[in-house]
Structure formats: C-alpha cells, structure tokens
Amino acid sequence: MKVGLIGAFLNNSNMGCVALACSIIRLLQEIEEEEKIKLDVTLFEASPGKEKLELYSRELDVDLQNFSFSETAWVYNLRALAHWKRHEEMKANLKKCDFIIDMTGGDSFSDIYGKKRFYFWSNIKKYIIKKKIPLILGPQTYGPYENKRVKKFAKYIIEKSSVVIVRDEKSLKYIKEIANVQAKLTTDVAFQLPCQKGTEIFLNNEKKKKIGINVSGLLYLENSDSSLSEKSFKTDYKEYIHDLISELLKKDDCEIYLIGHVKCDMEAVEKVQKLYPKCHTIPWQ
C-alpha cells in the first residue's frame, strides 16, 4: 500500500516540522507491525540527504530507510499546476498513492500567517481531492480563517477530505461551526516521539529542575512577520517572557534553558539571554 505524506518535513529548519514528520512515520511503522501490512511512504519534499536521515533515525528512534522523496513545487492555482511540465513527476507520484496524509506544518491550515501560505498548502489538497485520491487531514490545528474566500476554500477541503483529525478541542469546535463533517479529536502526534534523558543537559546539575523555554522570534522580535504584526494579542509576549523568566530565576531549584525551534528564534533567544545571563542557551542545529 502506497502512502503519501505532505506538510510534514524532514528537510526543514523548523524542528517542529521535523518532529511532526518523524512522529507520523513512527506511527505508520507501528501500524505496519500491528496490522502485518507493508506501507511504502513517500514524503513530498526534497530529500535532506543521507547524513541528516541517519541523524534523525538515531536521535529520534525512527527507521527512515525504506521510504522515498518526491520534490514538490508549490503553486498558487490549479491552472498553473495543470500546465507546468515540471510538476509532472510530482503529479505522477501523487496519483500512485492509495491515500495521502496531510499535516500542513501542524498549524498552517489558516490565514494567520497570510493568504500566501494558506494557498501554498491548500491548492495541493484541492488537486488531490479533484483526482479522487483519499485525503486524510492529520492531527493539526484548524483556523482561524479571517478572509471569507479563505474560509470558503477551507470548508471545501475539510468537507471533501476522507478523514478529518484535529489535535485540540478549540479546532474541533471551530470545524463544527464552519463545516458539515464529523472530525476526530486526538493529541499532537509529536507526543509519539520518545523522551531520551541522559544527554549532557541533564548532567549539569542533577539537583535542579531543568526548565526549557522556547522564545518565539515571530512574537518577540519587532517586524519579524508582517502578517502577525497586524494582529492584536491579549498578552504582551515580550513582557510575558520577561516576567516568566524573572519569576523562575527567584527559585533556587530551577535551571533555565532558552530554546529555539526555528532558526529565526535564535536572535530572540540571544537577546533574552543578554538580559538574563543566568539562563543557558541550547545551540540551534
């Protein structure tokens, strides 16, 4: 049985996307063992290369040997997808799949990051639906959809998909409001990854609690994302981060590690570390 996987990447600087991809692959491998079936998985992205595959396989305890990659060129409309010759290989590989699982990066099936990103992801879904390939919308966040045309397009995709899975109750409620479909509620697939204690971070001081804080570059740095700068937030994110760290540093039994899960977070991490030199930073890789 051939399975396609879109919207979850191994060749990506976003560690959340990598965790998403490895978790889905791990789940599919467990299904293979339990159901005694063979699944051939194709990730629709460029291959990250042998060294990265071996690293992820080792560190995340996932077998990454028996699946293939199909490079994907995203487009803004189906007319372009239908006519551009350089998409032929991608379209042929999509058609070979018995079903396709879409993760949309976990939280990008929305227009909160702008309409450009939404249409990037959604046109490929529409193509899959038009070709009558069963589409499973995997555990992810849905919405919000602020633009009316975006909401109508999202409703179409949700209702035409074979299975719709959400990873939070807010998304479940939102889907009930905008679409006529029975969505399934589960947890974020990243919880499927094993927790490995025993690395150097846990050996520095065994008596103290190790607290990791991800400082979001998108929210902490000014003008980092034009689509987010237009939003109104209930909380001042920069003030929240400062207050949280200040309170934790008052405790003698805590050791704080500032973490970036995408490359642009590291500028924010470095700025915060200068303000709070007692905090440790974990190098982004």
Predicted regions and their residues:
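Active-site anion-handling motifs in enzyme catalytic cores
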Residues: M1-Q285
